[in-house]
Amino acid sequence: PRQSGWCLYWNHSVTGDGVIDCYVDDLGKMVLHRAYQPDFAAGLGHYPGRGILTSAEGGGYWIEDIDEPVRNNAYVLRVGSLAVNHRIVTDRDEINLSKMAEHTRVTIRLDTGE
């Protein structure tokens, strides 16, 4: 069974629209499970064979069941400006990466206890 999850929220640097990538801890493996995209502009989109495309309530699209493992359980991100507003959101917390590390390369790593 899957364990805890978190989502990376941000505003697309070209369109300014909100984008979401949601990850889960799948028995010690970081896995991209689903993604929200407001439209398919500026590099966003769905690729056949990579998840299931569904319409989101209120507009936009969810790509469900992507289930793509993240290499080495580590996601490398260059944190965007305050306008991009990168943030990690869980059921209980929100961490604003743009406020903490604007324009900095960070690694988001799954802690497996090893």
Q: What is each PLM-predicted segment?
A:
Residues 1-38:
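N-terminal secretory signal peptides
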Residues 30-33, 44-114:
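Mature, soluble, non-transmembrane domains
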Residues 40-42:
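Mature extracytoplasmic/periplasmic domains
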